[in-house]
């Protein structure tokens, strides 16, 4: 999947982030360029991000052949907020992530590998619970181990496999 991430704010946002009108103009440009997968936001990053997603949903601006993606951390209240933002958006890609690298595990979270893996599993459980709560069966799940390059390869694989197991896609 070639997914444009030009619309998403977060820690790599522009010094002066785009406002809703600018995001709308950029979204329409990406459609005109032929993108079929577009990351439209990180709803917990700002109210502008949330409002932009709601605008796209309420005005039904997403063509039926386009999949939009949203990003959220594996945290219950943030996943719930993301579901509020995507209400009315068909077939969204929900991209969840959590930090898995050694530095963040030790310094930020003071957590073991097992505890970090559980954050990812709990993220998937929350997505599934929100799917029931919001009456959604069309969510496409994407998971990323944040800061993958600083994560031991065996652990990154272990976490991704645990996510697949919880989602019900074990190979």
Where do the protein language model's features map onto the residues?
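Alpha/beta enzyme core
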Residues: 2, 9-37, 53-63, 76-171
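Conserved short loop/turn motifs at secondary-structure junctions
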Residues: 40-45, 71, 144-149
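A glycine-rich helix N-cap at a beta->alpha junction
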Residues: 62-72
